[in-house]
Amino acid sequence: MIGKLSGTLDDKNPPQVIVDCHGVGYEVLVPMSTFYNLPELGARVSLLTHFVVREDAQILYGFATSQERAAFRELIKISGVGPRTALSVLSGMSVAELAQAVTLQEGGRLIKVPGIGKKTAERLLLELKGKLGPDIGVAASVANDSQADILQALLALGYSDKEAAAALKALPSDVGVSEGIRLALRALGK
């Protein structure tokens, strides 16, 4: 319903901000990653939003990027994860870190987020697999362009994100593309 707010930043009190849009102040809850990147009070601000209507409240959640909003929307689709928990997850880690944790099945990273226990972390890993954008999690762990090319080659050959990431970790960081692909294929063939 309300997809974006643009106006003047009137107040900042984590995790809530107030955005004045032509005399109407909207209370918006934002993840800490967005909060830390907000301008000073009185400056222009633009937030992508997700509007939640409940029986007892109407709440706006705001995000600096479309990736954050998309991740939030994927998180709240999961049973047992509401908007507050989704906001907590995005406050505890970036979208790229979340995608990497899901791709590499690292539940321990999710458990460190307040409000996420072992069962919820396992559910997140299972239900978010492949839903946070193509290769965003694996790409977050790539150190340089040649490793990115090696990763893309392995994915194009049909290897899963997890297999490709594991093979990439075993390679020296300064390896060339053709040599890296050869070594990765050898490691995956074992």
From Swiss-Prot:
Region annotated Flexible linker sits at 137-141
Report whether Acyltransferase shows up as a keyword of the record: no
- Which controlled-vocabulary keywords does the entry list? Cytoplasm, DNA damage, DNA recombination, DNA repair, DNA-binding
Pfam families xref list: HHH_5, RuvA_C, RuvA_N
Q: Where is this region: Domain II?
A: 65-137
As one GO molecular function, the record gives: four-way junction helicase activity
Tell me which GO cellular component terms the UniProt record holds: cytoplasm; Holliday junction helicase complex; Holliday junction resolvase complex
Entry annotated with the keyword NAD: no
**Which Gene3D superfamilies does its entry note?**
5' to 3' exonuclease, C-terminal subdomain (1.10.150.20), DNA helicase RuvA subunit, C-terminal domain (1.10.8.10), Nucleic acid-binding proteins (2.40.50.140)
GO biological process terms, alphabetically, are: DNA recombination; DNA repair
Subcellular location(s) of the protein: Cytoplasm
Q: Where is this region: Domain III?
A: 142-190
What main location does UniProt list?
Answer: cytoplasm
Q: Which residue ranges are recorded for the region named Domain I?
A: 1-64
Q: Which family does it belong to?
A: Belongs to the RuvA family.
Question: Its quaternary structure?
Answer: Homotetramer. Forms an RuvA(8)-RuvB(12)-Holliday junction (HJ) complex. HJ DNA is sandwiched between 2 RuvA tetramers; dsDNA enters through RuvA and exits via RuvB. An RuvB hexamer assembles on each DNA strand where it exits the tetramer. Each RuvB hexamer is contacted by two RuvA subunits (via domain III) on 2 adjacent RuvB subunits; this complex drives branch migration. In the full resolvosome a probable DNA-RuvA(4)-RuvB(12)-RuvC(2) complex forms which resolves the HJ.
- What does the record give as the function of this protein? The RuvA-RuvB-RuvC complex processes Holliday junction (HJ) DNA during genetic recombination and DNA repair, while the RuvA-RuvB complex plays an important role in the rescue of blocked DNA replication forks via replication fork reversal (RFR). RuvA specifically binds to HJ cruciform DNA, conferring on it an open structure. The RuvB hexamer acts as an ATP-dependent pump, pulling dsDNA into and through the RuvAB complex. HJ branch migration allows RuvC to scan DNA until it finds its consensus sequence, where it cleaves and resolves the cruciform DNA.
Regarding domains, what does the record say? Has three domains with a flexible linker between the domains II and III and assumes an 'L' shape. Domain III is highly mobile and contacts RuvB.
What NCBIfam families does the annotation carry? ruvA
Protein name, entry field: Holliday junction branch migration complex subunit RuvA
Gene behind the chain: ruvA
